[in-house]
Amino acid sequence: MAVVKCKPTSPGRRHVVKVVNPELHKGKPYAPLLEKNSKSGGRNNNGRITTRHIGGGHKQQYRLIDFKRNKDGIPAVVERLEYDPNRSANIALVLYKDGERRYILAPKGLKAGDQIQSGVDAAIKAGNTLPMRNIPVGSTVHNVEMKPGKGGQLARSAGTYVQIVARDGSYVTLRLRSGEMRKVESDCRATLGEVGNAEHMLRVLGKAGAARWRGVRPTVRGTAMNPVDHPHGGGEGRNFGKHPVSPWGLQTKGKKTRSNKRTDKFIVRRRTK
C-alpha cells in the first residue's frame, strides 16, 4: 500500500494525497451481497433537515458485511480484497468450505489465499474470531461485540483496534483508542488483529469537489450568517460577542452529550481524547 502525492498539474490536483493499494480487486463487487442504499440528503420522513452538510454524492450500493462471524468450525479462504465506499476500512470476500461467501472487514496483513476461521477452537492469528474469554490478555482485537451475538460494534474503522487488558470473572476489560477503558462480557466475540488500511488518515481530498462526490456539503460559519439564520450572525466585523452556541442556541463547546447513564457502570475510565 502506497501513499501517493499528485503532481500539481492543476489547482485541484496540487494538494491531493491518495492511498493506492494494488491488491484491491478492480472488478465489480459480489452481487448477491449487495443491497440498495438510498440517500436521505440528511432529511427525515417529514422532509426536514435532521443532519446538516449531507446531500448529493455518487450512487453507492451497500455491501452486506458479516459483523457476527458466527460460522463456527468451518474454515474459509480469502478470495480477494475490495474497496467499500461505505466505510474507511477495506473488506475481504471469503469463501467458506461449504460454498458460502461472505464479506468481512479486512484486518491488517490479510491477503488473498489466507485461511481464517471462527469459533472457540480457532487459532490465535489475525483474522480469526473467538469469544474474548479464549483470547490471551494483551492481544489487540477489532470488530468487538458489546453484547454476545449482536455483532461487532467497536473498532471497525480503518487502522483501529482494541486491547484486552484484563479478565475478571465473566467480564474482560478493554482499552479503546480514545483512552476509555470499559468492561464487556467475556462471551462477546472479537476478531484478532487491527483493522487494515491505516493509511486512510493520511489522504487529502485536495478540492471541494472531492468532498461533494462523497455526499458532503459545505459547512458555513455561523458568524458569516445573518441574525435570522444563526445566534452568531449579524453585527459589524467578525465578533459575535457571546459564548459559542449551536444554530439552536445550545452550548456547543465542551458540553457533555452522553445520555446513556444505564451503561455507566461498565466504564472503568473515561476517554482522554
Curated annotation (Swiss-Prot):
Sequence segments annotated as region (Disordered): 28-54, 221-273
InterPro entries listed in its UniProt record: NA-bd_OB-fold, Rib_uL2_dom2, Ribosomal_uL2, Ribosomal_uL2_bac/org-type, Ribosomal_uL2_C, Ribosomal_uL2_CS, Ribosomal_uL2_dom3, Ribosomal_uL2_RNA-bd_dom
Keywords: Ribonucleoprotein, Ribosomal protein, RNA-binding, rRNA-binding
GO cellular component: large ribosomal subunit
PROSITE patterns linked: RIBOSOMAL_L2
BP term (GO), one: cytoplasmic translation
Chain segments annotated as transmembrane: none
Low complexity composition-biased segments: 39-48
Function: One of the primary rRNA binding proteins. Required for association of the 30S and 50S subunits to form the 70S ribosome, for tRNA binding and peptide bond formation. It has been suggested to have peptidyltransferase activity; this is somewhat controversial. Makes several contacts with the 16S rRNA in the 70S ribosome.
Subunit structure: Part of the 50S ribosomal subunit. Forms a bridge to the 30S subunit in the 70S ribosome.
Family: Belongs to the universal ribosomal protein uL2 family.
Protein name listed in UniProt: Large ribosomal subunit protein uL2
Species the sequence originates in: Pectobacterium carotovorum subsp. carotovorum (strain PC1)
